[in-house]
From Swiss-Prot:
Family: Belongs to the sarcoglycan alpha/epsilon family.
Membrane-topology descriptor: Single-pass membrane protein
Subcellular localization, as worded in the UniProt entry: Cell membrane, Sarcolemma; Cytoplasm, Cytoskeleton; Cell projection, Dendrite; Golgi apparatus
Name under which the protein is recorded: Epsilon-sarcoglycan
Keyword presence, Ubl conjugation: yes
Pfam families in the cross-refs: Sarcoglycan_2, Sarcoglycan_2_C
Intervals, Cytoplasmic compartment: 339-437
Keyword Transmembrane: yes
UniProt keyword terms in alphabetical order: Cell membrane, Cell projection, Cytoplasm, Cytoskeleton, Glycoprotein, Golgi apparatus, Membrane, Transmembrane, Transmembrane helix, Ubl conjugation
Functional description taken from the UniProt entry: Component of the sarcoglycan complex, a subcomplex of the dystrophin-glycoprotein complex which forms a link between the F-actin cytoskeleton and the extracellular matrix.
InterPro entries reported in the protein's UniProt record: Cadg, Sarcoglycan_alpha/epsilon, Sarcoglycan_C, Sarcoglycan_N
Chain ranges passing through the membrane: 318-338
Species of the source: Macaca fascicularis
PANTHER family per UniProt: ALPHA-/EPSILON-SARCOGLYCAN FAMILY MEMBER, EPSILON-SARCOGLYCAN
Length: 437
């Protein structure tokens, strides 16, 4: 018995047939096989080439749907996945993008956008941008290359350029093709040029603006620079008149006749509009006059000798120490004279003090000393409330004033202080008079 091969064991692409010599696929199997091959080869995307013009706004959208099929397990036809995807962009061989190229992605569930205005220095040089997509759910990565071939533009740069500040837009909203097209259409109706191009778009945060509060659907604001081949219209020139300049200095909105053509969709801050006329700018470039490249003859070079003369630092050492020491000594002598030789002294103070004041002061001192001496020899009777249970001098225990069987009911509230053996009798003055029975 011959064992079946591996592709015949339940594979949807299994071969079927009657004989050994020829094997054929069924129509259903053929369709499934072709669909699988197409799905696999459709994941292998080749590098993309874009051809922007120098001095003209370049916008490239990194679509999440384009990269979803790069992450295994590959989705089946008709299956919708909403994995969070972020992008990292850099110039090949460098950690960051070119200076003129910016990138923005608001959330992992929104598309990323590369935008900027190519410079004339990069014309004819292919700029390869590495785009790395990260699936934040499965941690899978996919990498593609974007080849930017910058072409030279006609009439570059455009001679008349105007920069508008739109308050009710974010940069990713303004980069949408339909929104940018509506704005250029409104500018074209006001300016009436033959040729009009968007030159650059910059977020207000990149110009030092503040992050808006998350209330009332406030926007960051965006600066949009456009260029044309005809002079500015009278409506755009209205910003430069003195009345509107005064209103702008007072933080009031200027009066612009063509503002209603923008107001339906774009809120423009006319005080921040900038009009640049390239035809009136004076070139500051100065041609460099190159010389012959021969230096003037300075004679023969004489290097310093190898043997250096020894230098005596003893004098410098003495000067360094002597000068501060002398200054310190002079200051010390002056301070000593002031503190010791200029003191008045007690005798001089007494000579200048009146005699009556000295006598009064001496009397006060004598009285104070006498009171202090008398206070040391005081022996008066202590109050009963402060008498201790023992003798304060000998330390003997004092018997109580009354025995335990003493009738305290007849005791008066105010007792006369009895003289104890250790107390000194205080003489009392006796009044003379008659005693009545």
């Amino acid at each position: 018995m011959q064992l079946p091969r591996w592709w015949e064991l339940g594979d949807p692409c299994a071969w079927t047939g009657q004989g050994r010599g020829t094997r054929r696929m069924s129509p259903a199997t053929t369709g499934t096989f072709l669909l699988t091959v197409y799905t696999i080869f459709s994941k292998v995307h080749s590098d993309r080439n874009v051809y922007p013009s120098a001095g003209v706004l370049f916008v490239h959208v990194l679509e999440r749907e384009y990269f979803k099929g790069e992450f295994p397990p590959y989705p089946k036809p008709g299956e919708i996945s909403n994995d969070p995807i972020t992008f990292n962009t850099n110039l090949m061989g460098y950690p960051d993008r070119p200076g003129w190229l910016r990138y923005i992605q608001r959330t992992p569930y929104s598309d990323g956008v590369l935008y900027g205005s190519p410079t004339a220095e990069n014309v004819g040089k292919p700029t390869i941008i590495e785009i790395t997509a990260y699936n934040r759910r499965t941690f899978e990565t996919a990498r593609h290359n974007l080849i930017i071939n910058i072409m030279s533009a006609e009439d570059f740069p455009l001679p008349y350029q105007a920069e508008f500040f739109i308050k009710n837009m974010n940069v990713e909203e303004m980069l949408a093709s339909e929104v940018l097209g509506d704005f250029l259409g409104a500018v074209k109706n006001v300016w009436q040029p033959e040729r009009l191009n968007a030159i650059n778009i910059t977020s207000a945060l990149d110009r030092g603006g503040r992050v808006p509060l998350p209330i009332n659907d406030l926007k960051e604001g965006v600066y949009v620079m456009v260029g044309a081949d005809v002079p500015f219209s009278s409506c755009l020139r209205e910003v430069e008149n003195p009345q509107n300049q005064l209103r702008c200095s007072q933080e009031m909105e200027p009066v612009i006749t063509c503002d209603k053509k923008f107001r339906t969709q774009f809120y423009i801050d006319w005080c921040k509009i900038s009009l640049v006329d390239k035809t009136k700018q004076v070139s500051t470039y100065q041609e460099v006059i190159r010389g012959e490249g021969i230096l003037p003859d300075g004679g023969e070079y004489k290097p310093p000798s190898d043997s250096l003369k020894s230098r005596d630092y003893y004098t410098d050492f003495l000067i360094t120490l002597a000068v501060p020491s002398a200054v310190a000594l002079v200051l010390f002598l002056i301070l000593a004279y002031i503190m010791c030789c200029r003191r008045e002294g007690v005798e001089k103070r007494n000579m200048q003090t009146p005699d009556i004041q000295l006598v009064h002061h001496s009397a006060i001192q004598k009285s104070t000393k006498e009171l202090r001496d008398m206070s040391k020899n005081r022996e008066i009777a202590w109050p009963l409330s402060t008498l201790p249970v023992f003798h304060p001098v000998t330390g003997e225990i004092i018997p109580p004033l009354h025995t335990d069987n003493y009738d305290s009911t007849n005791m008066p509230l105010m007792q006369t202080q009895q003289n104890l053996p250790h107390q000194t009798q205080i003489p009392q003055q006796q009044t003379t008079g008659k005693w009545y029975p």
